[in-house]
UniProtKB/Swiss-Prot annotation:
Residue span(s) of the pro-peptide: 16-114
Glycosylation sites noted in the Swiss-Prot or TrEMBL record: N103
Organism superkingdom: Eukaryota
Catalysed reaction, written as an equation: Broad proteolytic activity. With small-molecule substrates and inhibitors, the major determinant of specificity is P2, which is preferably Leu, Met > Phe, and not Arg
Taxonomic lineage of the native organism: Eukaryota, Metazoa, Chordata, Craniata, Vertebrata
Physiological role: Thiol protease involved in osteoclastic bone resorption and may participate partially in the disorder of bone remodeling. Displays potent endoprotease activity against fibrinogen at acid pH. May play an important role in extracellular matrix degradation. Involved in the release of thyroid hormone thyroxine (T4) by limited proteolysis of TG/thyroglobulin in the thyroid follicle lumen.
Gene: CTSK
Name this protein carries in UniProt: Cathepsin K
Tissue-by-tissue expression: Predominantly expressed in osteoclasts (bones). Expressed in thyroid epithelial cells.
Enzyme class (EC, first level): hydrolase
Signal peptide coordinates: 1-15
Annotated disulfide bonds: C136-C177, C170-C210, C269-C318
Compartments in which it is found: Lysosome; Secreted; Apical cell membrane
Keyword Secreted recorded: yes
Amino acid sequence: MWGLKVLLLPVVSFALYPEEILDTHWELWKKTHRKQYNNKVDEISRRLIWEKNLKYISIHNLEASLGVHTYELAMNHLGDMTSEEVVQKMTGLKVPLSHSRSNDTLYIPEWEGRAPDSVDYRKKGYVTPVKNQGQCGSCWAFSSVGALEGQLKKKTGKLLNLSPQNLVDCVSENDGCGGGYMTNAFQYVQKNRGIDSEDAYPYVGQEESCMYNPTGKAAKCRGYREIPEGNEKALKRAVARVGPVSVAIDASLTSFQFYSKGVYYDESCNSDNLNHAVLAVGYGIQKGNKHWIIKNSWGENWGNKGYILMARNKNNACGIANLASFPKM
């Protein structure tokens, strides 16, 4: 029994006290990401989470160098948060309990001809810069706005930043920073006969009173279409033929939180646990691994300048084709 206690001591001490050898790195990370804490106890608590995440990243990248993984991780501005906190504060997908696809909104792909092997709407000028939703559950608004921006570019030739704040404040069927769903946003824009530009209705990262002003209207919508559930082939056709598509994924894993580069595939990703809305802006293949090009709304410091390549045709990894939709313009 005495020997067991001795063996457990290093583990317990690591859990209770920061590693002194990491002091300089911790201070550098805090300075880089402008982190401040309420008190010493709060900082130590966050430091221990950061150290745990740093260890996870290091072990993963060692495994990646040995060919175990197809992607790498890196420390970022979310380093002092647990994956549970990230889901709670920085996602926000909320699917209506009564949600069901109708034939009126179902996307029926045109299967004639072959879809391109790769598509990247960033290169075509359909995609605005990466945004940061902050600690507001407004991912659904950024995903919806991204799909609307793509269709606006396709129809008018103009690329404009549309207003996620307009959706956060005004879509009564959703819950603002408490979460929402993309098709509710498209329906709002249709019924409202428009959505303001970002310049006219800037993002503030919290829910406020609806201040939509028709003079700031930059786009409108005449409905939406939903991809057949779980059908990645149909999603590929939609991305190729229509443009950027709003999609929902499981973003609850630590591996997603610290993604850096490569094609993301984690067997633990749960296609039935959809909690985050993002935007599919293309697809392709890297080193033999098929992928979706996904735009996130966690800022450019996350992922590969705000983007992630997610595994494609791997049994609907992370549920990416389960709740996909796009607006009609």
